[in-house]
A protein has these predicted regions:
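Residue(s) in the substrate-gating loop at a strand-loop-helix junction
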Residues: 142
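Short, small/polar-rich loop/turn modules that mediate ligand/substrate recognition or access, typified
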Residues: 173, 178, 242-244
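Short C-terminal tail/terminal secondary-structure segment
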Residues: 91, 95-96, 243-258
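Substrate-binding pocket helix/loop in short-chain dehydrogenase/reductase
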Residues: 95-99, 103-108, 211
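Active-site helix of classical SDR
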Residues: 122, 157, 165
Length: 258
């Protein structure tokens, strides 16, 4: 398990009781404490971030009944959900491919995880948020939604996450609920790197070097901490007048010209 870097967490966020939907990748671990779904282990980082208790569980985001149980379990354990953070995602590991090669099953698999799961999590979390007249939803999309990306299911589903977030923000503002979406750029995570090793004969080192070269800020990919800080800030009262925003966290790659 990874230690929390010095200075990574300045203070607990002021919107406790977050529900983080996703916990197997580097990005998830930095946001809720190190949760490895294979081992279901948690480290104290979550207490540093959120200043409270931590619980982990298994959820199939492609199954509505599983999501409904997750929400009910969270409400039963903590009494409320102030923050819903939807983070589960898949691309090549789900069988994604260019549009001319994608199968119907693979397209359905990727979109059910990346988009439908978020819709269903919001569906079941919103009643309690509306009742308490407060809540924050932080979704994870991708810069792939706004840029050229060869794999159709991932790009389509992540574009849908942005549209979903905008709809959530407008429809729920009168209940005091905010919704924003983060668009990670090129990240140095296992999902991003390992799935590309071997494609076109590239080594891991070549994959990393090529991705690093495309980032203007520091010529280096972002880390899970970069996304974590953005998510924690959006979830806090420091971002209390921000809703419906799509926030790129990409080291300037989206504004690169030429």
């Amino acid at each position: 398990m990874d230690a929390v870097p010095a200075g990574a967490v300045d203070e607990p966020i002021d919107a406790p009781d977050p529900l983080v939907n996703g916990g197997g990748e580097d990005l998830d671990r930095r946001r809720v404490g190190e949760v490895e779904l294979e081992k279901v282990s948690v480290v104290p980082m979550a207490a540093s971030l959120f200043g409270g208790r931590v619980a982990a569980g298994f959820v199939d985001v492609a199954d509505e009944a599983s999501i409904e149980r997750m929400i009910a379990d969270c409400l039963g354990a903590f009494g409320r959900i102030n923050v819903l953070h939807n983070n589960v995602g898949v691309s090549l590991a789900g069988g994604d491919a260019p549009v001319e090669d994608i199968t119907a099953d693979a397209f359905d698999r990727v979109t059910s995880i990346n988009l439908r799961g978020m819709v269903l999590a919001c569906k079941h979390a919103l009643p309690s948020m509306r009742a308490q007249r407060r809540g924050v939803i932080v979704n994870i999309s991708s810069m792939a939604a706004w840029s050229s990306y060869p794999y159709v299911a991932y790009k389509t589903s992540k574009a849908g996450v942005i549209a979903l977030t905008e709809q959530l923000a407008y429809a729920n503002a009168r209940y005091g609920i905010r919704a924003n979406v983060i668009l990670p750029g090129l990240m140095n995570t296992p999902m991003a790197i390992e799935s590309r090793v071997g494609l076109d004969g590239k080594t891991r080192e070549e994959v990393i070097a090529e991705r690093d070269s495309r980032v203007p800020l520091g010529r280096k990919m972002g880390t899970a901490w970069d996304i974590a800080h953005a998510a924690v800030w959006l979830a806090s009262d420091k971002a209390g007048f921000i809703t419906g925003v799509a926030l790129p966290v990409d080291g300037g790659a989206s504004v690169r010209r030429g």
